[in-house]
UniProtKB/Swiss-Prot annotation:
Residues 260-343 are annotated as: Head domain (RuvB-H). Has 3 domains, the large (RuvB-L) and small ATPase (RuvB-S) domains and the C-terminal head (RuvB-H) domain. The head domain binds DNA, while the ATPase domains jointly bind ATP, ADP or are empty depending on the state of the subunit in the translocation cycle. During a single DNA translocation step the structure of each domain remains the same, but their relative positions change. Homohexamer. Forms an RuvA(8)-RuvB(12)-Holliday junction (HJ) complex. HJ DNA is sandwiched between 2 RuvA tetramers; dsDNA enters through RuvA and exits via RuvB. An RuvB hexamer assembles on each DNA strand where it exits the tetramer. Each RuvB hexamer is contacted by two RuvA subunits (via domain III) on 2 adjacent RuvB subunits; this complex drives branch migration. In the full resolvosome a probable DNA-RuvA(4)-RuvB(12)-RuvC(2) complex forms which resolves the HJ. The lineage of its organism: Bacteria, Pseudomonadati, Bacteroidota, Bacteroidia, Bacteroidales. This is Holliday junction branch migration complex subunit RuvB. It comes from Porphyromonas gingivalis (strain ATCC BAA-308 / W83). Residues 1-186 are annotated as: Large ATPase domain (RuvB-L). It catalyses: ATP + H2O = ADP + phosphate + H(+).
Length: 343
């Protein structure tokens, strides 16, 4: 499963050149950010108010599926505040010393962005509490009878935490965020505009019909839309004239096994596994993960949300179950109705 082409993981597999292109496509201001209208409206007000008062913005939690703009919004927050930004992630902060070094390097009102904040180790999270509330941390030196604590005072700062699994955050950590915002999947119209903007930045000709086609297969996710645009551009340059029109876009997307719903080989394999091996479900997440050779957290965090949103998969108290739409989409005969105790 991990060897299949998976456009959702392109951000992590890309080389330095690809990451440079991705950064080039990021909006730098609230005005240039498309979609998430209510989130952007509220954030822009909070940021403007903090700037007027000369204070650090309240700690902010951004949560929602991957690729919707959490990292981009953290960059915009720092840009709009006119302060510095430091970026890290939960798994990287192994020890309290890692956190202390990062926090002590922040200047007044700077922004610290922690991606995957739900993956912070408990001991690091404990140290973060006093930093968020009182702008100080207490570090223990030595062990045993000679152990002593030193207090490090910090400059006021804003912590922007991002997570795809807000339910895994502990209650004490969640309570320390003054701003809590959820990002939703984008509609096709908004994604089309993002594709057209990215095409202009990349200096590639892209027709409106082609942009609509790419947007329709992007799973409502800007990161995927931009990744698909770059791959379609490759096909246009090698197999076409260099310009992206609807025929070359369709050709490229079919070659990448991205269907009209935006499902790829990984999605098809997941749904087919539940149908073929488990009679359509219900089946437990860990059982599915074992059958696919994949991590349960990856399935739950990366693959499932869109399949559930689009009606291909549902969660029940007894496990995951595919829907009639999944049978139809895969060209399978829907299973017979199973009578319940109340039929």
């Amino acid at each position: 499963m991990t060897e299949e082409f998976d456009i959702r993981q392109e951000r992590y597999r890309g080389n330095d050149g690809e990451r440079e292109v991705e950064n080039k496509l990021r909006p730098l201001t609230f005005d240039s950010f498309s979609g998430q209208d209510k989130v952007v409206e509220n954030l822009s007000i909070f940021v403007a108010a903090a700037r007027l008062r000369g204070e650090a913005l309240d700690h902010t939690l951004l949560h929602g599926p991957p690729g919707l703009g959490k990292t981009t919004l953290s960059n915009i927050i720092a840009n709009e505040l006119g302060v510095g930004l430091k970026i890290t992630s939960g798994p990287v902060l192994d020890k309290p010393g890692d956190l202390a070094g990062l926090l002590s390097s922040l200047e007044s009102n700077d922004v610290l962005f922690i991606d995957e904040i739900h993956r912070l180790s408990p001991v690091v999270e404990e140290y973060l509490y006093s930093a968020m509330e009182d702008y100080r941390i207490d570090i223990m030196l030595d062990k045993g009878p000679s152990a002593r604590s030193i207090q490090i005072n910090l400059s006021p700062f804003t912590l922007v935490g991002a997570t795809t699994r807000s339910g895994l955050l502990t209650a004490p950590l969640r309570a320390r965020f003054g701003i809590n915002l959820h990002l939703e999947y984008y509609d096709v119209h908004t994604i089309t505009g993002i594709v057209e903007r990215s095409a202009r930045i990349l200096e590639v000709s892209c027709s409106h019909d082609a942009a609509v086609e790419i947007a329709g297969r992007s799973r409502g996710t800007p990161r995927i839309a931009n990744a698909l645009l770059r791959r379609v551009r490759d096909f246009a340059q090698v197999k076409g004239s260099g310009a992206i029109d609807k025929p070359i876009a369709c050709y490229a997307l079919e070659a990448l096994n991205i269907d009209r719903y935006g499902l790829d080989n990984v999605d098809h394999k997941l749904l087919a596994t539940i149908i073929d091996k488990f009679a359509g479900g219900p089946v437990g997440l860990s059982t599915i993960a074992t059958a696919l050779g994949e991590d349960p957290g990856t399935i739950e965090e990366v693959y499932e949300p869109f399949l559930i949103k689009e009606g291909f998969l549902k969660r029940t108290p007894r496990g995951r179950e595919v829907t009639e739409l999944a049978y139809t989409h895969l060209g399978r005969n829907p299973r017979p109705h199973r009578p319940s105790l109340f039929d």
